[in-house]
Amino acid sequence: MATVTSHDELRDLLGQPARRSAEKERRTLHDLDRQWLAASPFCLVATAGADGTCDVSPKGDPAGFALVLDDTTIAIPERPGNKRADGFHNILDNPHVGLIFFIPGRDDTLRVNGRATILRDAPFFDEMAVRGRRPQLAIQVEIEQIFYHCAKAFLRSELWHPETWHPDVLPRRAALVKEVEQPAETLADLDRHYGPEYAKNLY
């Protein structure tokens, strides 16, 4: 097994980025960035704790859920979940976050890197309400880098091509949880938990 152990070695292998890739980072939102955020219903939030422990958490809501506060600040609402709060614990120790915003059907993505603050309340929480419920918390991100990421990973994977989707290659959620995570629980109980009622308690 051959490993890469230096930045110089890595550059020797990969070469230098093209000018349009090297110079695409910005620190403020363009109007097109605002339009992208308004059209995006889903993002991934990457964090790392002080000890290096990493987490990537999906966040999703109706399109436009990431609220633009000003040219360098956005906020992402937190909805009821499993209460692990792995990413939040990481942010308390290390505020640096990386975000990727998706628009279904598009092969490019919008990336945002910055410093996060956890908010327990703010006047704009009312704007984030869904079905009459305000968020429990919000992640406010001060933008340090923003740029668009190329489409090659999506093109290679054919991610948005329905003919490549095969969701039934694995057991349903309840059966998977019983097999991997909670073998002592009954499948009937897990089916009830992950059944139709599961989608009724999103907010």
Give the residues covered by each predicted segment.
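Binding-site signature for planar aromatic cofactors or substrates
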Residues: 1-203
